[in-house]
Design a protein with these regions (language model features):
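Flexible coil segments in periplasmic/lumen-exposed cytochrome c-class electron-transfer proteins
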Residues: 1-101, 138-180
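Extended hydrophobic-aromatic, low-complexity segments
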Residues: 100-101, 114-115, 128-129, 141
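Short, cysteine/histidine-rich loop/knuckle motifs that typically chelate Zn2+
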Residues: 105
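Short Cys/His-rich local motifs and their 1-3 flanking residues in nucleic-acid-associated proteins
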Residues: 108
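Short functional micro-motifs and their immediate structural scaffolds
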Residues: 111
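Short cysteine/histidine-rich zinc-coordinating motifs and their immediately flanking basic loops
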Residues: 115-121
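Extended intrinsically disordered, low-complexity coil regions enriched in Ser, Thr, Gly, Ala
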Residues: 121-133, 137-145
């Protein structure tokens, strides 16, 4: 691609309206699920029902048939997170809660990223937890990974879940997208 073609592509994709991919829902119970195709899918029929969420994140397709069978790239997902996790995550993200650094210092005021530092707003909470855990344990390697080690050093698994719930609930410009 030429420089002009790259600029044209960047302009085109940059002009597209941001579309939420994950809807965050705080809850005490979640649909019972099975794992298929790397996804949590709600059980149907006699096996269907609810179970306590505990300290988990369950990401499932909004419309199982569209996602699993039709492979609709716009069907979206719902991320179930424990009740209260968004508020706890907000405290960790916005002021560090004496455990970590305020995320906006590097990731921007609206958590949309700054320069080479990636955005966090609206990302899959499961993905965010995995990245935080991998940086804490040293599994994640990369140019910027070492900068995150002191940031994640004191975080517990629950802290990571709460941070991920909050960041996933944020949209462009810091708008809340969570449901209760």
């Amino acid at each position: 691609m030429s420089d002009d073609e790259i600029k044209a592509a960047a302009t085109y994709f940059g002009s597209m309206k941001w579309t939420p991919w994950i809807r965050v829902v705080e809850t005490d119970t979640v649909p019972k699920t099975r794992i298929a195709g790397g996804m949590f899918l709600a059980l149907e029929g006699a096996e269907a029902g609810k179970e306590p969420i505990g300290q988990r994140i369950i990401e499932a397709p909004e419309k199982t048939e569209e996602t699993e069978l039709l492979r609709n790239p716009r069907s979206g997902f719902v991320a179930y997170v424990p009740t209260g996790s968004i508020k706890k995550g907000e405290a960790l993200v916005t002021n560090g809660a004496n455990k970590t650094t305020q995320c906006a210092v590097c990731h921007g005021a609206d958590l949309e990223g700054l320069g080479p530092v990636p955005g966090l707003a609206g990302r899959s909470p499961s993905y965010v937890v995995r990245q935080l855990h991998d940086m804490q344990t040293g599994v994640r390697k990369g140019t910027w990974s070492d900068l995150m080690k002191p940031v994640v050093a004191k975080l517990t698994a629950e802290d990571m879940l709460n941070i991920a719930a909050y960041t996933a609930s944020r949209g462009p410009g810091g708008a809340s997208r969570s449901a209760r």
